[in-house]
Amino acid sequence: RTAQFAEDAGPMAHPVRPESYMEITNFYTLTIYEKGSEVVGMIHTLLGPDLFRKGSDLYFERHDGQAVTTDDFVRAMEDASGRDLSQFRLWYEQSGTPELTVRDEFDDAAGIYRLTIKQSIPDTPGQTDKKPQHIPFAIGLLGAEGESLPLKLAADDAD
């Protein structure tokens, strides 16, 4: 935690896309470059390689040689994929790094594995009321012999 996005945990914490800045040299920070690249990587994970490439192609078609914003990039990803990434924009707007609490349990009799993830984002200077951020990640289950097991989400039963 202290090695990844250390700036996010200190008094200089700021969003990837700050609302304002004192001078442009203040804009070249670890948060903007390192965390910003991780946010782009999460969009890649969320959309998958094909839709991400489609979004990248659209982005360059629209904005080649122009000064752009993160909103231009996200909009191209939305338009190319048909996905609404408005909740994902919080990664650009909020400072701080989400902290996850993970709990898991396996009900052997029912054959059910439960994974519960809770998210909190510590207060940072100027931002105390944080909204949960979308964190894409992949999960899978393996059997005793290392084989992949079918995964069925509890939400699938609600249909």
Residue ranges and their predicted role:
Residues R1-D104, L115:
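Hydrophobic alpha-helical and helix-loop surface patches within well-folded domains
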